[in-house]
Structure formats: C-alpha cells, structure tokens
C-alpha cells in the first residue's frame, strides 16, 4: 500500500519507539499503536489515490476493492483499535494525569463520531456503486473527509497523548496496556495477524493496482 507523508501523522512516515531492554518491553504498546496508525494511513492513502485516479480519468472504479478497504477501516480500527485505546490507555492516563482530561474527552468524542463517519462512507460507496458517475463526487468527498478526520485524530494521539502516557503511566499500567494491545490482530502486522484480517489485507493488496498494490493496472 502507498505511504505518503503530506499532512499525515508521524506514524505513517517512519517507525519510532523502537527501544530495547526493560523500557522497550514496557513501551511496546506504543509501537503497536503506531503500527496500527500506519496501517490505517496506508489504507486511506490507497483510497485517496484511487479516488484521484478516477477523477483524473486514469482509472475506473473497482467496487470490490473499495468495499474491502471500507470493511477494513470499519472492522479493525473502529471495532478493535479504538475500544482498546479507550479501555486501557485513555482510562489509565486519565487516572494518573487528570489534566489530560480535556484532550481525552475530545478523542472520545472523535471515536464516537468515527462510527457515524464510517457509516456515511459506506452509504456513499453504495450510492456510487448503484448510481454511477453522478454519485462519484459525493463518494470522493466522503473519502477525503474521512481521511482528513482520521489523520487529525491520530496526530492528536501521537503528539499529545502518547508523550503524556510515557511521562505519567507506571510500569504496571504499561503491563496492562501491553497485554491488551498485543492481542490485536492487524492484517498489516503479519506476525500477529488473525486469519480473517490477514486474508483481507492480502485481498486488498492483490486487488489494488500499482503503486498501491500488486493487482492489475486499470
């Protein structure tokens, strides 16, 4: 999947928090969170690339591919990644550092808004598939809106929340967070991938044309 750097959170550019020893073990959840952010960023970049290619007349719509991408966004970040952030990282940071409350409240509201936005994206895709070219602009707008929303959200987590977590959470807190996030099954993190999600990622990569995948050019 294509990974660009413009207006995206740091996780979608270069890995970080690659530490060794006790500190590395304690902070491995941050690496997982950043890896999962990169996974979502790659899917969003892919969708934006396809939308722009269609708009420029360089590609025709592949609704199977779009459907797989939207399903990934719904199935992994919205159902697994965000709930674990809320249940473990945000809860413990709020306990250890109450001053983070306003930013955590903002992120919680964005998690809830994300569920609405993914439904809007699904609906826009269905309308485009059944309504044809007249519905393309609305679908493209939904993709661009969702991507901008999520990049802003991830940037807040990485620039504001993760530094506070590193500063204020205890070793015991990190053990709890690490155990929770280590159980995630992200299709773009091969070693921990569950069969369903790994198969989904392979399907997306095989369907997507170059340079975002290995599928046929359109």
Where are these regions (language model features)?
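Small-residue-biased structural context
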Residues: 2-4, 10, 14-218
């Amino acid at each position: 999947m294509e990974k660009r750097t413009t207006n995206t959170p740091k996780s979608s550019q270069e890995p970080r928090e690659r530490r060794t020893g006790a500190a590395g073990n304690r902070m491995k959840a941050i690496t997982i969170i950043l890896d999962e952010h990169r996974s979502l960023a790659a899917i969003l970049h892919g969708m934006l690339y396809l939308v722009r290619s269609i708009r420029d007349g360089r590609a025709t719509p592949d609704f199977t591919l779009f459907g797989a991408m939207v399903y990934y966004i719904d199935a992994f970040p919205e159902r697994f990644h965000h709930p674990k952030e809320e249940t473990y990282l945000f809860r413990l940071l709020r306990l250890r550092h109450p001053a983070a409350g306003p930013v955590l409240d903002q992120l919680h509201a964005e998690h809830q808004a994300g569920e609405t936005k993914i439904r809007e994206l699904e609906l826009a895709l269905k309308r485009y598939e059944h309504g044809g070219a007249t519905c393309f602009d609305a679908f493209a707008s939904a993709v661009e809106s969702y991507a901008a929303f999520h990049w802003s959200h991830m940037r807040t987590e990485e620039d504001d929340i993760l530094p506070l977590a590193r500063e204020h959470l205890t070793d015991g807190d990190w053990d709890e967070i690490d155990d929770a996030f280590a159980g995630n099954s992200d299709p773009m993190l091969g070693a921990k991938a569950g069969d369903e999600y790994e198969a989904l990622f392979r399907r997306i990569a095989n369907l997507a044309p170059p340079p975002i995948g290995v599928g046929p050019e359109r």
